[in-house]
C-alpha cells in the first residue's frame, strides 16, 4: 500500500496495477499536468487508485512531528495530509519532497523517491540570526533583536 504526493505522481511511471495506491483530495487538486491527470483519472476509474483523507487526529500528530523537526513551514496542507494518511494506513509514501522525507523519517514512516535521491540524513532545523547569532523558533523570519533575516540551519543529525 502506498500514499502518493503530487511530485511522486508527476515524476513516476506508475500504472497502478501492481499495488494499492491512495491519494488525498488536496494532492488530487494539485495535479494539473494533463498527462498526470489522465493517469490519475484512469487509476481512480479502475479502482486501483483510491481517494482518502486522513483524520484530524493524524494531521495533528504530523504537525507536532513537523514542529519538532522544524519542517512545518516547509510543508503544504497536501504534504501534511500525505504524511497523516501514511501514519493512518501504515502505507509507504512516494515522494521526492525532502521535507516530507525528513518528517517521515522522524516518525519512522516508510518512503521512497521517484526522480531524485532521497535524504541521506535526518535533520532538526532551527532559525539562526547571521547578524547576532541568536537562535529562534522556526516560525520566525526576522531576528527579534536586530531585525536581520534568519537562516535555516541543520541543528543536529538525528541519524546517518
Tell what function each PLM region has.
Residues 92-95:
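Short glycine-rich phosphate-binding loop at a beta-alpha junction
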Amino acid at each position: 500500500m502506498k500514499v502518493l504526493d503530487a511530485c511522486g505522481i508527476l515524476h513516476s511511471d506508475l500504472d497502478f496495477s501492481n499495488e494499492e495506491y491512495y491519494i488525498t483530495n488536496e494532492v488530487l487538486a494539485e495535479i494539473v499536468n494533463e498527462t498526470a491527470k489522465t493517469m490519475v483519472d484512469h487509476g481512480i476509474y479502475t479502482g486501483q487508485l483510491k481517494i482518502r483523507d486522513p483524520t484530524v487526529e493524524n494531521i495533528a500528530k504530523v504537525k507536532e512531528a513537523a514542529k519538532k523537526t522544524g519542517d512545518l513551514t516547509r510543508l503544504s496542507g497536501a504534504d501534511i495530509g500525505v504524511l497523516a494518511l501514511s501514519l493512518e494506513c501504515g502505507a509507504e509514501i512516494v515522494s521526492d519532497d525532502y521535507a516530507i522525507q525528513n518528517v517521515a523519517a522522524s516518525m519512522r514512516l516508510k518512503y521512497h523517491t521517484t526522480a531524485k535521491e532521497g535524504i541521506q540524513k535526518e535533520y532538526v532545523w532551527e532559525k539562526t540570526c547571521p547578524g547576532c547569532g541568536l537562535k529562534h523558533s522556526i516560525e520566525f523570519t526576522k531576528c527579534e533583536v536586530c531585525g536581520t533575516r534568519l537562516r535555516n540551519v541543520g541543528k543536529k543529525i538525528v541519524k546517518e
